[in-house]
Amino acid sequence: MSDYIIKVGKRKTAIARAIIRKGSGKFLINGYPIELYPIEILREKMLEPIRILGDRSKEIDIDVNVHGGGNTGQADATRTAMAKAIIEYFKDSDLEAEIRAYDRSMLVNDVRRKMPKKPMGYGARAKRQKSYR
């Protein structure tokens, strides 16, 4: 195991960089403890890789810097970055299989983007109504 590992996770326009190192079980998001994250459902989503890790989470510290996007995109990017960093730090194939079985999207960046608006419409697919015919 090296001193620290840096991994990146992306979702929509959000980019999260997770730094994992030996420690005492502290998990910071942009310098604040993860327990202070205001949206509970997103906080639980970000804690999933740590919950899968179990008792071994007490021997590491994870510091995540995330920017861009909105709340959900940032939460998904954070979750992906943390899961990738945990797998590389512990180098445990059983742990990777467990995370992959729980949710494959924790290890794969979601590349979907918003479809651009088209001319003569209100959005990507919606069109203005025609009053004739």
UniProtKB/Swiss-Prot annotation:
List this protein's GO terms for biological process: maturation of SSU-rRNA from tricistronic rRNA transcript (SSU-rRNA, 5.8S rRNA, LSU-rRNA); translation
**What InterPro entries has UniProt attached to this entry?**
Ribosomal_Su5_D2-typ_SF (IPR020568), Ribosomal_uS9 (IPR000754), Ribosomal_uS9_archaeal (IPR019958), Ribosomal_uS9_CS (IPR020574), Ribsml_uS5_D2-typ_fold_subgr (IPR014721)
Q: Signal peptide: which range, if any?
A: none
Name the GO cellular-component terms: cytosolic small ribosomal subunit
Pfam family name, one: Ribosomal_S9
Q: What are the record keywords, sorted? A: Ribonucleoprotein, Ribosomal protein
Query: What molecular function does GO assign, one term?
Result: structural constituent of ribosome
- Assigned protein family: Belongs to the universal ribosomal protein uS9 family.
Q: What is this protein called?
A: Small ribosomal subunit protein uS9
Q: What organism is recorded for this protein? A: Picrophilus torridus (strain ATCC 700027 / DSM 9790 / JCM 10055 / NBRC 100828 / KAW 2/3)
User: Source gene?
Assistant: rps9
